[in-house]
Amino acid sequence: MATAHLRTFIGALRFRETYTGNEPKIVITTPTGQLHELGALMVAALVSVDGWLPVYLGPNTPADEIVACAMQSGARTVSLSLTYPADDPRIPTELTRLRSQLDQKIPIFVGGSAAAHHYDLTNRLGLLSPPTLDELRHSLKMLRQSQIGASA
């Protein structure tokens, strides 16, 4: 019950911003098998304050759907939350499929309590895993600034 209330509260936070349509988009979700979405919701709320437009897919999203959403929305990046179970045998397949199908120019961020469990895999795939939310926000700020500079 407390989780449902917290989810509603965090979900409402991310819709308080007024969007202009010029914000860069970020797809936020949890991969197949990952049902705990509070971390993903927190990221959605935080990045909206930082000028990103979160495209929130909810939990348990297959790699193919993440790729399709990123391509259709024109997302500049993808953020995944990995929490429980840390040793989910589907994670390596889903992350590998996501990285292979998504444009290599689109960075993929991975965070959450189970991200460290998959460090070797995420490193090999070139996924980014900032250890804190502040570092994620900083990385997204740098990404946004580099893309603004590239389009000028």
Identify the residue ranges that each predicted region occupies.
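C-terminal regulatory/effector modules of DNA-binding transcriptional regulators
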Residues: 1-2, 8-152
